[in-house]
UniProtKB/Swiss-Prot annotation:
UniProt note on tissues of expression: Spleen and thymus. Expressed at much lower levels in the brain and liver.
SUPFAM superfamilies: P-loop containing nucleoside triphosphate hydrolases
Protein name as catalogued: Deoxyguanosine kinase, mitochondrial
Organism: Mus musculus (Mouse)
Highest taxon in the source lineage: Eukaryota
Length: 277
């Protein structure tokens, strides 16, 4: 719990401005409970399932929506705090690559960073244009919830996180999410579904350096985690509100990147889903 309090102080420090707190904390919480404010969606899916392509399609179809992409560049280039004499920051390493190369050593560190970066994104103030819009939408590429119930959970189950690391992670994860509960509420999940084999093919095609050591077995594990949560409903969730969030399942087995007809179908399903939220 001490770790949770320390992280909480750091987060609160980033939102210290009285004006910002007045705009973000109470009104945002009231808006969420009153049914007002932006609809908050999260896109979930396996590694290389096509989330980035889908996000670009969403942004093209709905330029009025605010879309927050996954902060991969931050994970690939960890910078030391404070500037050096020349005004630059010291580069500490590529944590994404380090995690894949030595999962037993770096998984806890990586999951701490990934959770904190997602949390900060989801806590960012609502832009004025969204507050003024009649029907505004915020979209997040993955969430603080999948960080725990998909990725960290899987790393624990495959032995990359120790018992004590998993216990500590869950402790401060629960503490922080309870502390910021009103500001992290989601109205819907969009689950992009494809087989591990399809994801493996797309992973090879995008040829990201850090992912060259990923094996099919790992994608199969993550696929099972997604299916257990979004399809089979067997994942034990510790936040009651999360258990009732609607899920739109989109089959993205077929490559839709240059298929206009399939793109139209997918966006039609999204629009129908949004109307029912």
């Amino acid at each position: 719990m001490a770790a949770g309090r320390f992280l909480l102080r750091r987060l609160r420090a980033s939102f210290r401005s009285p004006l910002r707190n007045a705009l973000v904390d109470a009104p945002h919480a009231r808006a969420m409970h009153d049914g007002g404010g932006p609809r908050r969606l999260c896109i979930e899916g396996n590694i290389a399932v096509g989330k980035s392509t889908f996000v670009k399609l969403l942004m093209k179809t709905h330029p009025e929506w605010q879309v927050a992409t996954e902060p991969i560049a931050e994970w690939q280039n960890i910078q030391a705090a404070g500037a050096q004499k020349d005004g630059t920051s010291k580069r500490l390493g590529n944590l994404l690559e380090m995690m894949y190369q030595e999962p037993a050593r770096w998984s806890y560190t990586f999951q701490t960073l990934s959770f904190m970066s997602r949390l900060k994104v989801q806590l960012e103030p609502i832009p004025g244009r969204l507050l003024q819009a009649e029907k505004s939408v915020r979209v997040f590429e993955r969430s603080v919830y999948s960080d725990r119930y998909i990725f960290a959970k899987n790393l624990f189950e495959n032995g990359s996180l120790s018992d004590i690391e998993w216990h500590i992670y869950q402790d401060w994860h629960s503490f922080l999410l309870q502390e910021f509960a009103n500001r992290l509420l989601l109205h819907g999940f969009i689950y992009l579904q494809a087989s591990p084999q399809v994801c493996m093919e797309r992973l090879y095609q995008r040829d990201r350096e850090e992912e060259k050591g990923i094996e099919l077995a790992y994608l199969q594990q993550l696929h099972s985690q997604h299916e257990d949560w979004f399809i089979n409903k067997t994942t034990k969730l510790h936040f009651e509100a999360l258990q009732h969030v609607p899920v739109l399942v989109l089959d993205v087995t077929e490559d839709f990147s240059e298929n206009a007809a399939r793109q139209e179908e997918l966006m039609g399903q999204v629009n129908t889903f949004m109307r029912n939220l």
